[in-house]
Regions:
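Bacterial Sec-dependent N-terminal signal peptides
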Residues: 1-24
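Long, internal stretches of domain cores in catalytic or enzyme-like folds
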Residues: 23-149
Length: 149
């Protein structure tokens, strides 16, 4: 009982500190710091299952499978739309942070968009960079011929 009382007291002592951490910073505070670089790591968005229609996995399950809009293991239309939203979010963040101007057209020395060589990864990167730099000619880089899993 004493231990629980101590933990609750400690929690109430820490709560005001944590709310300070979430406080909106003033413009004067923000002007002291300059964002110079950003690294964004991401995984592919929504993809169709690896198993195809007529696979052993489909045959042993008792329920009918959902009809996917994409081929096996490929990025879906919904996944592309969601990745586009991520690109819009990061575009706003990078403009607000002062790293890029609105409608920037960065050079290859300023931005590197790199994807794994799977179709779903390349497509994810394309949707993202299209929303991030809508007027820019940013290329998606990958090492190998696009493949499927």
């Amino acid at each position: 009982m004493n231990r629980n009382f101590f933990l609750v007291g400690l929690l109430f002592a820490i709560l005001p500190i944590s709310t300070f951490a979430q406080k909106q910073r003033s413009q004067a505070f923000k002007e002291k710091y300059i964002l110079k670089e950003a690294v964004i790591l991401s995984r592919h968005n929504i993809r169709a299952p690896l198993s195809t229609k007529g696979s052993l996995l489909e045959k042993v399950t008792t329920h009918p499978w959902f009809e996917w809009t994409a081929g096996a293991s490929e990025l879906t239309t919904r996944g592309g739309a969601l990745e586009n939203q991520f690109g819009l979010y990061f575009r706003k963040w990078l403009v607000d942070a002062g790293l890029f101007k609105e409608n920037a057209n960065p050079t290859t020395n300023e931005v590197n968009v790199y994807a794994n060589s799977m179709q779903r990864c390349i497509a994810t990167a394309n949707y993202f960079k299209t929303a991030l730099f809508p007027v820019g000619d940013v290329k998606v880089n990958h090492r190998f011929v696009p493949s499927k899993m």
